[in-house]
């Protein structure tokens, strides 16, 4: 049920002219509720007025939009409106321009000055882009251009003021503390946006609008460009670095890791699709692997590591043994792991802290099954997220897997997509998993008996679209939903959408 504050805020933002006249008399405690109502209601004129008169030092999207205190929490799950995000950015720029031009007599006189715009933690797009929402890449480009524009205009204004003073023979005034707004943001860059982001980061340190990166993601970017951007990031603000599809190889990773050592708060390092294969190393490459492991060990705050799609057969002990602290999240999808790798994990210090584990794409049906079950038993008391997509797990393995999986009492997410499990197998899995009180999302595979030709089951997700008996598949889905109703677990989502968990921030688990 919505609160009275929420209902009143929604009514107020519908009357822009009246609200604008009343803003000077409005208690500052109402601003968060008004902002949320205006943002979710797409009241852009109201949003701009609220931002330009914001009475607090911090304006945080995540805290304002995800608070359940003032508005319907169901609305907060919607993806942010592109127009509303642009409006807030424009409002901050206008606010800053007025403050720089008018100084202490400007519109913020008597109010606490806005110092931080926090745009981190916003809902991200799924697989399909919605033209009415704003992707992380688009937000990055928009903010970069805004930073450059504000910096240029400020420099021009400073030069004009200086010229006027010289022409009037007025001595320079004592330097005052610079007025600026810090923008805490997650950045996503590729070769298309590299130039504008680099320019923005270069001017950011002395611009009135200063970018502070929390999570940095780069795709399909050259080694030199990636290293250059890492050098421009604030060492104290970076929490996550995600480099993917960059074809870096061991040599490239060893060039970049020294640039990361300065990030004292770096908790997450994601290096999927880095073209690393340790199965046949030359002596020089062996030295490179040892250097890579040694430099990983220098990242003292690291608690999340993704080495997906690198062939790491038999080398987990070497790579993870030197880390300064146990990992809480480990993603090893399609890493060609051996039994000795999983046995090492079961005995390592990481075993006591792992909350997220992704072993997708490793064949758990044969030699890896026993060490996998042993590892799962060891981490069952604190595991929150398990992804075993495309691991060749079939009905024959469920009798061994289910008893251990049911011990994972804190499990929130389970990924079983693209495993050759039958409809009967899925029913058995559901009957067991409804006992787990924290489990709210299961991504299950298309049952093998729903294929037009079950003998030609494919483990490749891209080939699954056209080979089903769609009527049978629909019936199975409906039956699973009915089972959830009978078990009184309507809070649990069972889906075949493998992208549904894309927006999950594992650092917030």
Curated annotation (Swiss-Prot):
LRR repeats lie at residues 111-146, 210-234, 235-262, 263-298, 299-323, 324-355, 356-374, 380-407, 408-432. Keywords: Cytoplasm, Leucine-rich repeat, Repeat. GO terms for cellular component: cytoplasm. InterPro entries: Leu-rich_rpt, LRR_dom_sf, PRAME_domain. It is found in: Cytoplasm. Its main location: cytoplasm. Belongs to the PRAME family. LRRC14 subfamily. This is Leucine-rich repeat-containing protein 14. The lineage of its organism: Eukaryota, Metazoa, Chordata, Craniata, Vertebrata.
């Amino acid at each position: 049920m919505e609160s009275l504050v929420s209902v009143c805020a929604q009514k107020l933002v519908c009357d822009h002219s009246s609200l604008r006249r009343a803003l000077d008399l409005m208690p500052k405690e109402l601003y968060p509720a008004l902002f949320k109502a205006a943002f979710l209601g797409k009241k852009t004129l109201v949003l701009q007025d609220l931002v330009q008169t914001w009475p607090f030092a911090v304006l945080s999207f995540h805290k304002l939009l995800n608070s359940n205190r003032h508005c319907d929490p169901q609305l907060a799950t919607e993806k942010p409106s592109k127009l509303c995000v642009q409006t807030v950015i424009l409002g901050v720029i206008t606010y800053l321009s007025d403050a720089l031009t008018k100084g202490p007599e400007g519109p913020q006189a008597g109010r606490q000055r806005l110092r931080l715009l926090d745009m981190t933690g916003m809902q991200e797009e799924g697989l399909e882009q919605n033209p009415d929402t704003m992707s992380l890449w688009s937000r990055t480009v928009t903010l970069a251009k805004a930073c450059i524009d504000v910096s240029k205009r400020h420099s021009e204004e400073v030069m004009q003021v200086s010229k006027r003073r010289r022409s009037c023979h007025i001595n320079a005034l004592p330097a005052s503390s610079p007025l600026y707004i810090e923008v805490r943001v997650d950045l996503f860059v590729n070769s298309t946006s590299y130039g504008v982001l680099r320019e923005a980061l270069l001017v950011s340190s002395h611009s009135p609008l200063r970018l502070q990166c929390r999570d940095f993601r780069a795709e399909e970017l050259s080694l030199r460009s990636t290293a250059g951007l890492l050098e421009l990031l604030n060492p104290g603000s970076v929490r996550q670095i995600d480099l993917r599809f960059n074809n870096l190889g061991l040599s490239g990773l060893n060039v970049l890791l020294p640039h990361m050592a300065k990030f004292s708060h770096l908790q997450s390092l994601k290096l999927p699709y880095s073209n690393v294969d340790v199965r046949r190393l030359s002596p020089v490459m062996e030295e490179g692997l040892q250097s890579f492991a040694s430099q990983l060990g220098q990242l003292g705050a690291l608690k999340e590591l993704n080495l997906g799609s690198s062939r790491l057969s038999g080398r987990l002990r070497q790579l993870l043994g030197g880390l300064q602290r146990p990992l809480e999240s480990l993603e090893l999808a399609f890493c060609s792991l051996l039994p000795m790798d999983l046995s090492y994990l079961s005995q390592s210090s990481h075993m006591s802290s792992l909350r997220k584990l992704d072993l997708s794409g490793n064949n758990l049906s044969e030699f890896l099954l026993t060490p996998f079950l042993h590892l799962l038993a060891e981490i069952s008391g604190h595991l929150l997220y398990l992804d075993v997509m495309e691991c060749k797990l079939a009905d024959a393995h469920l009798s061994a897997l289910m008893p251990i999986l049911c011990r994972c009492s804190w499990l929130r997410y389970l990924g079983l997509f693209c495993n050759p499990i039958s409809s009967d197998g899925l029913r058995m899995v559901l009957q067991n998993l409804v006992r787990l009180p924290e489990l709210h999302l299961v991504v299950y595979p298309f049952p093998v008996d729903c294929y037009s030709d079950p003998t030609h089951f494919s483990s490749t997700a891209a080939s699954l679209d056209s080979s089903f008996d769609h009527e049978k598949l629909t019936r199975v889905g409906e039956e699973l939903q009915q089972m959830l109703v009978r078990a009184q677990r309507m809070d649990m989502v069972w889906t075949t959408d493998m992208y549904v968990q894309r927006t999950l921030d594992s650092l917030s688990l």
